[in-house]
């Protein structure tokens, strides 16, 4: 098709000026003006001297008309005809009927540039322009070319033009160039039609960039004037040598409703780039319409004038696409070899139609998709990340089938071109994007030839990137109607890695976020903000030291009432409630436990009162005392003696004692071996969790080695549970039954049904010992804590010395509790003997239960007994060590 192009938008076509191609970008008409057309025939090129002016070359073109051109001029007064295919295989819109005018050579003024008609189509097999012969039954009669005629053929073009007019309106500049085009193009277009009719061969240099590669002074002046009027910089608009590669601009819009060309498979990281500029939207854009040219070494995509170089396998003669030239470069490119630069130019390729029957077109998008970028932004900090995310990790782009740096394949040579904005002479300012060199050289870890790191994070691709056939995903930041969103954040791998001295002490992308170097020059933070005293219980602001701990007034009053009162608190949860400023009143049990753990005790306040009382007694002048004072002193002494019998250690043991744990047994079901044993195993795992929490809260336990802590718990858990169950049976059912849990109480029938009657009898006997010896709750708590440190491996623990010291301290605490109630040393020794004998009796019972549970675990699949995961692991790993003799209990008396 033939679409009229003005500067920055679609305008009504001048009398004889047509352009075959889609609307490209803002700089399309500028390129048409500044680039010098070459001779239309080889003989004309040879006849014209190198320094010939534009007027002489165009006069030669004027004289080379053909009979076909004369027939076209004579047949312009005919009626309009339907659309047809032109000589290049594209759908042609007939020109408007124009009166025949005498052809005259256009005058090339210094302020103007002579604009020729674009050349013929480019063959995909060779990448060179070639003229296709037109069918004999076709003619070039004109037809109206208004935008209304474009609507039926291209459904999205009418809506696209409205958006383009709003975004890219340059009416004043268009009028100036339109007048120049009407004067300068008529002769070139007529000579072009003559050559098309005659079928004369075209020169290899006869492409859209013109026959020559130089830019005249007049065209350069006009380019600068247009650039200044559009607010662009003119310092980069210099002469481009024949080998220099033009950098593509960053603003373009594809024609909608056009069937896509052959598209190769994208490289793997393109679809996986997170937060990149690519997405999977339904509306395909540049990647869908870019030309696949085997001559260039694969899929060419001109987002920033870069070539992915993904090699394809299309046939050489399967070209029906129209290759459009690159636009005006805003940056001066580095010089390359002329032949290599000609083959690897990265144009914006948008096929209008394919030779032959076209494939079904995709559904048209309701809006034009315009990509808006500022070319100057490539010097910013996020430019490297944008390029890296657009093409994915460059290291992974070098696929398994890629040719090596020295392969010498055509695709390898052609795909070596990269973004020429950054040269190899510039220093490396940013770290490499993505790393990993292996297998052929990645983007940052391979050889310098395969993946040289350019400044600003751009990584030059290795030679011969290979791709697969498939579809590219649509870009992510394509905004319909010209909407521009916020620029995505840069990738962490593309952030500048070399910072200034002030950033040396930051971590992460910017170093350690603490100014280590400035710590020597500033005062500590405590100098400006004194540390606030907080309550050890709830974290509120502390008012002072109350009852031996730094607490607030609320926790002080709570502890006084809870400790002096006889009410016993129970936690509704698992004795692990959160106690803070806002939730300290939710659970008084956990709050009181935390008070004891912090070291609060009523004796501390009484000792303080005793000290004040002694001072008062020393200061009294008279030595006489009243009966009331004597009574008060006796009460004080009795309270002090009571405090000495109830040390802080005992208060902590009372606070951390676990609560009641239920087994979850269904008592409505008939008792069976599998049901009873499964419930016992479930209860064992629940209690094991509480044992671990209780052990960690014991004074001095956390000072053990971590491995020793785990070993002590895994070896003593059975004895602790048996001892606690005996105490519950004594206090709840007077040792007549085994009180495992409130919902799991074993009577004689259940003892027999569980097939562990002998073990149950020994456990019941242990429970009866509590009654016979009249064990107090304080003695039980201290004995239970001492039982935790009564079984160790034969080889010893990692910190055996500290374990022995801790165990000895608990033995002394037990002796102190015994001595608190008895004044006779003989009675204390007898009591100590009884209690230690009771502790020794727990170990044989625990060993029998170890053997029973281990045998049951082995046969569990046969008897349908469920073992929880943690219980099964401990029984299968730790119990065999006890049964084999590698772990032995510590006895107080000889067995």
From Swiss-Prot:
<feature type="modified residue" description="Phosphotyrosine; by CSK">
    <location>
        <position position="347"/>
    </location>
</feature>
<dbReference type="GO" id="GO:0008284">
    <property type="term" value="P:positive regulation of cell population proliferation"/>
</dbReference>
<feature type="modified residue" description="Phosphoserine; by STK4/MST1">
    <location>
        <position position="626"/>
    </location>
</feature>
<dbReference type="Pfam" id="PF00105">
    <property type="entry name" value="zf-C4"/>
</dbReference>
<keyword id="KW-0862">Zinc</keyword>
<keyword id="KW-0449">Lipoprotein</keyword>
<dbReference type="GO" id="GO:2001237">
    <property type="term" value="P:negative regulation of extrinsic apoptotic signaling pathway"/>
</dbReference>
<dbReference type="GO" id="GO:0000976">
    <property type="term" value="F:transcription cis-regulatory region binding"/>
</dbReference>
<dbReference type="Pfam" id="PF00104">
    <property type="entry name" value="Hormone_recep"/>
</dbReference>
<feature type="zinc finger region" description="NR C4-type">
    <location>
        <begin position="571"/>
        <end position="595"/>
    </location>
</feature>
<dbReference type="InterPro" id="IPR013088">
    <property type="entry name" value="Znf_NHR/GATA"/>
</dbReference>
<feature type="region of interest" description="Interaction with LPXN">
    <location>
        <begin position="527"/>
        <end position="894"/>
    </location>
</feature>
<feature type="modified residue" description="Phosphotyrosine; by CSK">
    <location>
        <position position="208"/>
    </location>
</feature>
<dbReference type="InterPro" id="IPR001628">
    <property type="entry name" value="Znf_hrmn_rcpt"/>
</dbReference>
<feature type="binding site">
    <location>
        <position position="728"/>
    </location>
    <ligand>
        <name>17beta-hydroxy-5alpha-androstan-3-one</name>
    </ligand>
</feature>
<feature type="modified residue" description="Phosphotyrosine; by CSK and TNK2">
    <location>
        <position position="252"/>
    </location>
</feature>
<comment type="similarity">
    <text>Belongs to the nuclear hormone receptor family. NR3 subfamily.</text>
</comment>
<comment type="function">
    <text>Steroid hormone receptors are ligand-activated transcription factors that regulate eukaryotic gene expression and affect cellular proliferation and differentiation in target tissues. Transcription factor activity is modulated by bound coactivator and corepressor proteins like ZBTB7A that recruits NCOR1 and NCOR2 to the androgen response elements/ARE on target genes, negatively regulating androgen receptor signaling and androgen-induced cell proliferation. Transcription activation is also down-regulated by NR0B2. Activated, but not phosphorylated, by HIPK3 and ZIPK/DAPK3.</text>
</comment>
<feature type="domain" description="NR LBD">
    <location>
        <begin position="644"/>
        <end position="875"/>
    </location>
</feature>
<feature type="compositionally biased region" description="Low complexity">
    <location>
        <begin position="175"/>
        <end position="200"/>
    </location>
</feature>
<dbReference type="GO" id="GO:0030522">
    <property type="term" value="P:intracellular receptor signaling pathway"/>
</dbReference>
<keyword id="KW-0805">Transcription regulation</keyword>
<keyword id="KW-0863">Zinc-finger</keyword>
<feature type="modified residue" description="Phosphotyrosine; by CSK">
    <location>
        <position position="331"/>
    </location>
</feature>
<keyword id="KW-0479">Metal-binding</keyword>
<dbReference type="GO" id="GO:1903076">
    <property type="term" value="P:regulation of protein localization to plasma membrane"/>
</dbReference>
<dbReference type="InterPro" id="IPR000536">
    <property type="entry name" value="Nucl_hrmn_rcpt_lig-bd"/>
</dbReference>
<dbReference type="GO" id="GO:0030521">
    <property type="term" value="P:androgen receptor signaling pathway"/>
</dbReference>
<feature type="compositionally biased region" description="Polar residues">
    <location>
        <begin position="201"/>
        <end position="211"/>
    </location>
</feature>
<feature type="compositionally biased region" description="Low complexity">
    <location>
        <begin position="44"/>
        <end position="81"/>
    </location>
</feature>
<dbReference type="GO" id="GO:0000785">
    <property type="term" value="C:chromatin"/>
</dbReference>
<feature type="cross-link" description="Glycyl lysine isopeptide (Lys-Gly) (interchain with G-Cter in ubiquitin)">
    <location>
        <position position="821"/>
    </location>
</feature>
<feature type="cross-link" description="Glycyl lysine isopeptide (Lys-Gly) (interchain with G-Cter in SUMO)">
    <location>
        <position position="371"/>
    </location>
</feature>
<dbReference type="GO" id="GO:0005497">
    <property type="term" value="F:androgen binding"/>
</dbReference>
<keyword id="KW-0804">Transcription</keyword>
<protein>
    <recommendedName>
        <fullName>Androgen receptor</fullName>
    </recommendedName>
</protein>
<dbReference type="GO" id="GO:0005634">
    <property type="term" value="C:nucleus"/>
</dbReference>
<feature type="site" description="Interaction with coactivator FXXLF and FXXFY motifs">
    <location>
        <position position="873"/>
    </location>
</feature>
<keyword id="KW-1017">Isopeptide bond</keyword>
<dbReference type="GO" id="GO:0005737">
    <property type="term" value="C:cytoplasm"/>
</dbReference>
<feature type="region of interest" description="Disordered">
    <location>
        <begin position="33"/>
        <end position="155"/>
    </location>
</feature>
<feature type="region of interest" description="Interaction with KAT7">
    <location>
        <begin position="600"/>
        <end position="894"/>
    </location>
</feature>
């Amino acid at each position: 098709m033939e679409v009229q192009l003005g500067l920055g938008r679609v305008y009504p076509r001048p009398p004889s000026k047509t352009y075959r191609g889609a609307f490209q970008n803002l700089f399309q008409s500028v390129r048409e003006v500044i680039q010098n057309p070459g001779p239309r025939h080889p003989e004309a090129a040879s006849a014209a001297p190198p320094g010939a002016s534009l007027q002489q070359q165009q006069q030669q073109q004027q004289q080379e008309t053909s009979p076909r051109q004369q027939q076209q001029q004579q047949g312009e007064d005919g009626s309009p005809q339907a659309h047809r295919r032109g000589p290049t295989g594209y759908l042609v819109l007939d020109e408007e009927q124009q009166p025949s005018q005498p052809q005259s050579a256009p005058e090339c003024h210094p302020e103007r540039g002579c604009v020729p008609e674009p050349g013929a189509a480019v063959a995909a097999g060779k990448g060179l322009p070639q003229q296709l012969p037109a069918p004999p039954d076709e003619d070039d009669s004109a037809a109206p070319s208004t935008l209304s005629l474009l609507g039926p053929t291209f459904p999205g073009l009418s809506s696209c033009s409205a958006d383009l007019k709003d975004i890219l309106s340059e009416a004043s500049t268009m009028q100036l160039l339109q007048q120049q085009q009407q004067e300068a193009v008529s002769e070139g277009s007529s000579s072009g039609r003559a050559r098309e009719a005659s079928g004369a061969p075209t020169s290899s240099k006869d492409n859209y960039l013109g026959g020559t590669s130089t830019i005249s002074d007049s065209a350069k002046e006009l380019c600068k004037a247009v650039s200044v009027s559009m607010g662009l910089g003119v310092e980069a608009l210099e002469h481009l040598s024949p080998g220099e590669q033009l950098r593509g601009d960053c603003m373009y819009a594809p024609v909608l409703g056009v069937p896509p060309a052959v598209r190769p498979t994208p490289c793997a990281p393109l679809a996986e780039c997170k937060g990149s500029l690519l997405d999977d939207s339904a509306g395909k854009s540049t990647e869908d319409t870019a030309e696949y040219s085997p001559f260039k070494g694969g899929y060419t995509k001109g987002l920033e004038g870069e070539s992915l170089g993904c090699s394809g396998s299309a046939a050489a003669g399967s070209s029906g696409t129209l290759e459009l030239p690159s636009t005006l470069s805003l940056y001066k490119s580095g010089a390359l070899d002329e032949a290599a630069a000609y083959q690897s130019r990265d144009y914006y390729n948008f096929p209008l139609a394919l030779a032959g029957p076209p494939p079904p077109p995709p559904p048209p998008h309701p809006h034009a998709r315009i990509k808006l970028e500022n070319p100057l932004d490539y010097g910013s900090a996020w430019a490297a990340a944008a390029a890296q995310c657009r093409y994915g990790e460059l290291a992974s782009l070098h696929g398994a089938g890629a040719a090596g740096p020295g392969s010498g394949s055509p695709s390898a040579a052609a795909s070596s071109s990269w973004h020429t904005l950054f040269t190899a002479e510039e220093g490396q300012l940013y770290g490499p994007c993505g790393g990993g060199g292996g297998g052929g050289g990645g983007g940052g870890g391979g050889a310098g030839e395969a993946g040289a790191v350019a400044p600003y994070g751009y990584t030059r691709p290795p030679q011969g990137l290979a791709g697969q056939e498939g579809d590219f995903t649509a870009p992510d930041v394509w905004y319909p109607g010209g909407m521009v969103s916020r620029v995505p954040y840069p990738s962490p791998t593309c952030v500048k890695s070399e910072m200034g001295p002030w950033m040396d002490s930051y971590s992460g992308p910017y170093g350690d976020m603490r100014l280590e170097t400035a710590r020597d020059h500033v005062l500590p933070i405590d100098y400006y903000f004194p540390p606030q005293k907080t309550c050890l219980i709830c974290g509120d602001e502390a008012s002072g030291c109350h009852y031996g701990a730094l607490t607030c007034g609320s926790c002080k009053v709570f502890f006084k009432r809870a400790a002096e009162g006889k009410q016993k608190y129970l936690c509704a949860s698992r004795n692990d409630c959160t106690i803070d400023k806002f939730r300290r009143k939710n659970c008084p049990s956990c709050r009181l436990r935390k008070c004891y753990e912090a070291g609060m005790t009523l004796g501390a306040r009484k000792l303080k009162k005793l000290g004040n009382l002694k001072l008062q007694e020393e200061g009294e002048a008279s030595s006489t005392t009243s009966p009331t004072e004597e009574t008060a002193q006796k009460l004080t002494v009795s309270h002090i003696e009571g405090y000495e019998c109830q040390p802080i250690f005992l208060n902590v043991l009372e606070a951390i004692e676990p609560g009641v744990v239920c087994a979850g047994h269904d008592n409505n079901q008939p008792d069976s071996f599998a049901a009873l044993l499964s419930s016992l195993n479930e209860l064992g795992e629940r209690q094991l969790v509480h044992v671990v929490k209780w052990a960690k809260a014991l004074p001095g336990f956390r000072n053990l080695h971590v491995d020793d802590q785990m070993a002590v718990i895994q070896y003593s858990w059975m004895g602790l549970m048996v001892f606690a169950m005996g105490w519950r049976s004594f206090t709840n059912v007077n040792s007549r039954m085994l009180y495992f849990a409130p919902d799991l109480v074993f009577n004689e029938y259940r003892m027999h049904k569980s097939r562990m009657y002998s073990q149950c009898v020994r456990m019941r006997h242990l429970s009866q010992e509590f009654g016979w010896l009249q064990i107090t709750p304080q003695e039980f708590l201290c004995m239970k804590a001492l039982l935790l440190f009564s079984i160790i491996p034969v080889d010893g623990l990692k910190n055996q010395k500290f374990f022995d010291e801790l165990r000895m301290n608990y033995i002394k605490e037990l002796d102190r509790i015994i001595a608190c109630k008895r004044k006779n040393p003989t009675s204390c020794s007898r009591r100590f003997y009884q209690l230690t004998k009771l502790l020794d009796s727990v170990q044989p019972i625990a060993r029998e239960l170890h053997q029973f549970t281990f045998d049951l675990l082995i046969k569990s699949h046969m008897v349908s007994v469920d073992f929880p995961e943690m219980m099964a692991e401990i029984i299968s790993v730790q119990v065999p060590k006890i049964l084999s003799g590698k772990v032995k209990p510590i006895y107080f008396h000889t067995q």
